[in-house]
Amino acid sequence: DAGEKLLCELGYRLGHTLGEGSFSKVKAATSSKYKGPLAIKVVDRRRAPPAFAYKFLPRELSIVRKIRHPNIVRIFELIEVCNGKLYIVMEAAATDLLQLVQQLGKLPCVPKARDIFAQVVGAVRYLHDRDLVHRDLKCENVLLTADGRRAKLSDFGFSKEANSYPDLSTTFCGSAAYASPEVLMGIPYDAKKYDVWSLGVMLYVMVTGCMPFDDTHIRSMPQRQKKGVLYPEGLPPLPEPCQALIAQLLRFSPASRPSVGQVAKNSWLKG
């Protein structure tokens, strides 16, 4: 098609499909311009729902244009084609955090989980310092290099500009399993504190290999979240500072959760 022809003219070679959604797909690619493997996300605006095409996508594009951080997936180029297709050229990753956790069962708390989590916290702090929020933090949105050492945050489809309280959000974003009580209850929420909660879920998943809260019955999740987090039986005890950090991130009341800047200063994370 016209878009793929244009990509060839621009020096890109498309490979196999890495993933597919209802109105987008991600393909492996290489280029004469950039070193290393690339991924190209192809978005078909004409097949996308209006809320996505006119609200979430423009936000995502305006945000990814202005962020550069070693722990955030780099976007090299945005190519608009008159047939309604958009090509987002970005760095490719070998795997993601969810795949790594599934492969290993769980991650050793120190140094593996701690090192990866510290990098993700650094990326989220970079965003929050610029009044940007992610709103879809989960293990599958943390990409990893082949050696598993460098983490890169991806997928800014629900991100937006958000100043802190009283600028509250109302859109339910992300996955229920990573959603905070206030988001699940439909209460206008401080999106930065929602990101902090999701970080808590992510750290729990990394070190236990399980979800902290069962999301089969979403309506009753906030009651379970209020009781606090439990650990699977038979799991060797986690380091006390790691458990304490998870408990802080998963505090029921958003106001009592730390900011991501405070999390970044956590002595256990700094090793």
Predicted features and spans:
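Protein kinase glycine-rich loop
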Residues: G15-G21, V26
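Glycine-rich ATP phosphate-binding loop
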Residues: K25-T30, Y34-R46
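Conserved N-lobe beta3->alphaC-helix segment of eukaryotic protein kinase catalytic domains
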Residues: V43-I67
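A short, aromatic-enriched beta-strand patch in the conserved N-lobe beta-sheet
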Residues: E77-I79
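Conserved short submotifs of the Hanks-type protein kinase catalytic core
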Residues: N83-D96
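Activation segment signature within eukaryotic-like protein kinase domains
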Residues: I116-F117
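Catalytic-loop of the protein kinase fold
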Residues: H128-L144
